[in-house]
Structure formats: C-alpha cells, structure tokens
Amino acid sequence: MGSLDAKPAAATQEVSIKDQAQLWNIIYGFADSLVLRCAVEIGIADIIKNNDGAITLAQLAAKLPITNVSSDYLYRMVRYLVHLNIIEQETCNGGVEKVYSLKPVGTLLLRDAERSMVPMILGMTQKDFMVSWHFMKEGLGNGSTTAFEKGMGMDIWKYLEGNPDQSQLFNEGMAGETRLLTKTLIEDCRDTFQGLDSLVDIGGGNGTTIKAIYEAFPHIKCTLYDLPHVVANSHDLPNIEKVPGDMFKSVPSAQAILLKLILHDWTDEECVNILKKCKEAIPKETGKVIIVDVALEEESNHELTKTRLILDIDMLVNTGGRERTADDWENLLKRAGFRSHKIRPIRAIQSVIEAFP
C-alpha cells in the first residue's frame, strides 16, 4: 500500500506573467542585436550627432539614406532604441513633440568615433556569423568540430582568410574594442611595461595595441606578429617591426610576449602549445608573458559576469575556445611550465595575467 499512502507531490509552482515575459524576452533576444544593426546601417547615431541639438523624428527621417521613409516604422525602431538606453527621448513645445539625442552608449555607434563598435556590430550580426548558432546541438558531441565549422564547412580562421572583407571587418571590430581596452591596460598597468626592453604582440591584428604601447613606452622595441594576410593589411607602423608567422610554429624572441584576447580563442591543448612557444622565446630570469583575457568568476553577481558568460558561449560556438576561471589559468600555466603567475583585475571585462618562466 506504500504508493497509496504516500502524500501527494507538492503542486508545481504557478508560472507568473513575469516568468512568461522573461522567456519572451529571451526568445526575441535577437531583436536587440538586429535592431542595433539596422540603426548602424542607416546611420541613425551619426545623423543625431551631426544635427544641431536634439532631433525630431521628421528631421531624422529626412536625413536617412532611404526614400519615402515610413514614419511609423522609424518611430517604432527609435522607440525600441530608447528602451535599450541607446537614445534619449525628451519632449518639447509643451510636451507635444518628441526629440531624440544620443546617450553615452549611443556614441559607440558613431562610425568615426575612436572607440566605435560599428565594425563589431556589423561583423557579429552578418548572416554567416549567425549561422553557427543554429548548429549548437551538433557541437555537443565529444571531439566534435565547432558549431561554426558545422554550419560553414570550415573553421572561423579559414573563413576569415578566404573572405577578405569579413576579415577586415573582424580586425576593425577588434581594433575598436582594443582602443578602449589598451587605454585601460596602459593606465592601470604601467609597471607591467616599464623596464621592458622588447615586446612582441602575438596575434596583434592591425597593430592598434602595439602602436599605443610604443607611443606610451617609446624605449621598448616593439614587434607586431600575426598571420601573413593579417600583417599585410595592418596599419602603417613606423618604428614597429612587422613579422608574419604562425604562433603554433614559432614566436619571435623578446623580453616579454603579449597575448591580448588570443588564448580564449583556443582549446586548452592549443593554449599549452602556444604558451610553451612563448616561454621558449623569453629569457628565463627577466622574461614574462602578459595575457589579457577574462578571468571568469562563475558564481559572481558582478555587473560584468553576464557579459563574460556571453563571451564564453561565443567562444564555444565560433572558435572552440573558452573564457577561463582563475583555477583554469593556473592549471594551464603550470602545464606550460611557468613557475608563477599573478592575476590583476583592471577596469575592463578582461584581467591581466602575468606569467613568469
């Protein structure tokens, strides 16, 4: 009679309208990024900035690169951008007319801004980069290729090498992210670079980071190191040596090696390989590897934790890499033969990890 005498299971907790709304918001999460993309494509932020003061909807419509603009369509888009806290909405003429201006985050949508995120927005939301997210299930098997490779038939690096326009957009996007990050890196970690006589920026893209470091520390002999097709398209960099190559095969010798936003792209085995090459390239007594990457705190309620977890999923889907915890970094560096390391939080999503041979 056991089952008959058992007390009934507690009733399932009732689902609230708030729960449903949360799930709707998640389902339509792509609306945020694609409304943002549309705003960038038609130059809404630039039009607002170039206007003399706040702009009305009619003024905005008149300046769009589109004929016969639907005022209702535009209003609903702008209303959503207001909800996303990208655009500020105010009223004038006794409250009968709405006018719009940019909030601070909206300035990142300006094409000519030093820290513009326009290339990153356009690159990450273009169709090819959206395909991989539909192949997450196929990536679950052990030993499987990435979701990107499942969807596109090649890994992300082969794709970028074979698509110069997308490669340029990717590197411009990274450069925009890099400008803000590098400024913070230099301001918060001057002692990391002072005293160095030479530095190689591995996977340095178009040279934005190494150029800023050289300008801040002109006594350092600086080298940009990346794949041949990337180096060929890098900025003009006076006083900085450019070396094409493959970090999995060799790394130029220097007192210090910089790996900024590199290791999160790769598996642990690949990272150990890269780090061993870096260790071989630096002097045992005075050398170091400077890693700039996320140090993930999985249980933290920090305001940046969700962003860091999103970046981890991005790595999972597109590169096969990961964002790592402090323990992950310790294990990785020990496997690569480094005797010690220290992790320093900075005013950024990433931290600075200095590893000593």
UniProtKB/Swiss-Prot annotation:
<dbReference type="InterPro" id="IPR029063">
    <property type="entry name" value="SAM-dependent_MTases_sf"/>
</dbReference>
<feature type="active site" description="Proton acceptor">
    <location>
        <position position="264"/>
    </location>
</feature>
<dbReference type="InterPro" id="IPR036390">
    <property type="entry name" value="WH_DNA-bd_sf"/>
</dbReference>
<dbReference type="InterPro" id="IPR036388">
    <property type="entry name" value="WH-like_DNA-bd_sf"/>
</dbReference>
<dbReference type="Pfam" id="PF08100">
    <property type="entry name" value="Dimerisation"/>
</dbReference>
<feature type="binding site">
    <location>
        <position position="226"/>
    </location>
    <ligand>
        <name>S-adenosyl-L-methionine</name>
    </ligand>
</feature>
<comment type="function">
    <text>Involved in the biosynthesis of benzylisoquinoline alkaloids. Catalyzes the transfer of the methyl group to the 4'-hydroxyl group of 3'-hydroxy-N-methylcoclaurine to form reticuline. Can also use laudanosoline and, with a lower activity, 6-O-methylnorlaudanosoline and norlaudanosoline as substrates. Also involved in the papaverine biosynthesis.</text>
</comment>
<dbReference type="InterPro" id="IPR001077">
    <property type="entry name" value="O_MeTrfase_dom"/>
</dbReference>
<protein>
    <recommendedName>
        <fullName>3'-hydroxy-N-methyl-(S)-coclaurine 4'-O-methyltransferase 2</fullName>
        <ecNumber>2.1.1.116</ecNumber>
    </recommendedName>
</protein>
<comment type="subunit">
    <text>Homodimer.</text>
</comment>
<dbReference type="InterPro" id="IPR016461">
    <property type="entry name" value="COMT-like"/>
</dbReference>
<comment type="pathway">
    <text>Alkaloid biosynthesis; (S)-reticuline biosynthesis; (S)-reticuline from (S)-norcoclaurine: step 4/4.</text>
</comment>
<dbReference type="GO" id="GO:0030784">
    <property type="term" value="F:3'-hydroxy-N-methyl-(S)-coclaurine 4'-O-methyltransferase activity"/>
</dbReference>
<keyword id="KW-0949">S-adenosyl-L-methionine</keyword>
<keyword id="KW-0808">Transferase</keyword>
<comment type="similarity">
    <text>Belongs to the class I-like SAM-binding methyltransferase superfamily. Cation-independent O-methyltransferase family. COMT subfamily.</text>
</comment>
<dbReference type="GO" id="GO:0032259">
    <property type="term" value="P:methylation"/>
</dbReference>
<keyword id="KW-0489">Methyltransferase</keyword>
<dbReference type="GO" id="GO:0046983">
    <property type="term" value="F:protein dimerization activity"/>
</dbReference>
<dbReference type="Pfam" id="PF00891">
    <property type="entry name" value="Methyltransf_2"/>
</dbReference>
<keyword id="KW-0017">Alkaloid metabolism</keyword>
<dbReference type="GO" id="GO:0008171">
    <property type="term" value="F:O-methyltransferase activity"/>
</dbReference>
<dbReference type="InterPro" id="IPR012967">
    <property type="entry name" value="Plant_O-MeTrfase_dimerisation"/>
</dbReference>
<dbReference type="GO" id="GO:0009820">
    <property type="term" value="P:alkaloid metabolic process"/>
</dbReference>
